[in-house]
């Protein structure tokens, strides 16, 4: 029987002969932020059937030496001869690493991967001064409200101090905004302007405005409108029609937040508001219509037409409002409408008077039976007068 020593020697001698892996020395350099570190050298095992080591074999060796996340945080490339110089060829995990033709060495370079999430801006994006001031004020208000609302941990003295700081910061930001507006404004006026907060605090502001407007009316014949403060909010104006107006003055009323009461004199070129369409509704007895149509003479047709046109033109020019139309114009239109064609019982519902001095009548026709027409004609006053004369 062979001894134990002989068996151990034979086993040790046969192991390198029947080994399925080869060893290769690989030189690699790490590049971080454009700077190359000192080169490193490691021994990499790869199978015998391969022409050379792959990138996966190198990563397996580096994971055992430096940890699992190190190889994947770099992009790898190997050095290769190209014409009279050399180049770096990028590698994937299954690509073979080719040696240099002159020395037969394996040279690798590892470049740090680019991560967009870790990139930070050198400075925050710009914001306008007004937005910064509003943001600071809002933060102060929020902090003050949070601290003041916590009554369990904040004493009364601390609460008073926080309230003072809050009011001071608000007043400071308000004054700074007013200074900026005054610097950039072209308004040059010596009148006293009131801000939005002053109007809220002083409740007698509308009364003082009315008194000032009354004094200016008595003192001056022509009033020039005051210039509004540049920081004031836009006001909404609406014309208020007045029946009895002296001269050609128009009064303006403000809706919402009123800043000033402005009065203007209408010049010859001032555009007027378009005339509104007015409608009067009235019902007249059919017997009265028949009596008026038969008793009126043909010579009177021209005179009411002139009066009607004159009256309609006055209505369109005047700015006052009327509750009902005049009686003569209405009856004249009804007489004209009744004479056209044969007489039929009709009821007038409404009359439209337009700015163009034209009148329109809307008549609702309805068919009547012969009995109703005869009864209407028989009981009419005109028919009774004729029967009495006979």
From Swiss-Prot:
Chain residue ranges for the region called DIX-like oligomerization domain: 22-115
Membrane in keyword set: yes
GO cellular component: a single term: plasma membrane
Biased segments, Polar residues type: 304-321
Chain intervals for the UniProt region annotation (Disordered): 210-247, 291-321
Record has Cell division as a keyword: yes
GO molecular function: protein homodimerization activity
Subcellular localization(s) per the UniProt record: Cell membrane
Pfam family, one: SOK
Keywords: Cell cycle, Cell division, Cell membrane, Developmental protein, Membrane
Membrane-protein topology: Peripheral membrane protein
GO biological process: cell division; plant organ morphogenesis; protein polymerization; regulation of cell division; specification of plant organ axis polarity
Domain-related comment: The DIX-like oligomerization domain is required for polymerization, edge localization and biological activity.
Function: SOSEKI proteins locally interpret global polarity cues and can influence cell division orientation to coordinate cell polarization relative to body axes.
UniProt subunit comment: Homodimer. Forms long polymer filaments with other SOKs proteins polymers crucial for polar localization and biological activity.
Protein family membership: Belongs to the SOSEKI family.
Miscellaneous notes: 'Soseki' means cornerstone in Japanese.
Protein's recorded name: Protein SOSEKI 4
Organism listed in the record: Physcomitrium patens (Spreading-leaved earth moss)
Encoding gene per record: SOK4
